[in-house]
Amino acid sequence: MSGERFLDRRGFLARGLAAASTALLGGCDDLSDQPWVKRVLDSAEELTRVTQRALLTPQALAREYSEADLSKEFKANGSTDPQEPDYLAHVKTGFADWKLAVGGLVEQPLSLSFEELRAMPSRTQITRHDCVEGWSCIGKWKGVPLSVVLDKAKLKENARYIVFYCADNLFDTGDEKDRYYESIALVDAYHPQTILAYEMNDQTLAVAHGAPLRLRVERQLGYKMAKYVMRIEAVDQIATIRGGRGGFWEDLGYEWYAGI
């Protein structure tokens, strides 16, 4: 097993901020709607991010496990069967005509087929998936390191974040702007365990788990692991994208930095 040096982020927050949270939020149902409270919480999130970055080297690995540790059942949550017409068309053909678009602040925009991605250098890792809801599962993932794709696209100097646009729409509105999206900083994009997974437990990724491609960013919580990835974009800021918080759940109040 490798990379067992990691930080329990939720434990850190609980120890460092429990008293302050109780004093600020106890008995006040709508206090979190106040702008000044939002600023305090945003500052706490940034403090957590900076502290964890200081304690962990950029290349510190999430713990990896053996095949004997694999969960008997890996829970599928969030979207498990997207009904968007374009996605259903790809499912029907086994993703034969699907291509991953890579653009934004890159010198060489890409359009990569499933077979082209599978032909790239790959990484296999057995890691634990920690959900913000409190459950965890251990699974085996194989995919192309995100760094390989980004290097092929040749990021421009002003690129700071990588954004992932997905096929699923949790609101079922039929509006593309409501589809799932996520973003990570370059330090996480280039982490050796950050991969675009196309296999799970030695099988081609199933629809329920994000086929054809799912992001694995192993040092963060599960909602950062975007499923059904259709397009990747390199950007210099995330504040101008949709709700301005950098992700589907983040726009609804979750923390953008979900390190564990």
What do the PLM-derived regions correspond to, one by one?
Residues 15-18, 152:
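Residues within well-ordered alpha-helical secondary structure of globular protein domains
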Residues 31-260:
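Structured, non-membrane catalytic/scaffold regions adjacent to prosthetic-group chemistry
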Residues 12-13, 102:
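Short low-polarity hydrophobic stretches
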Residues 1-7, 11, 18-26:
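N-terminal secretory signal peptides
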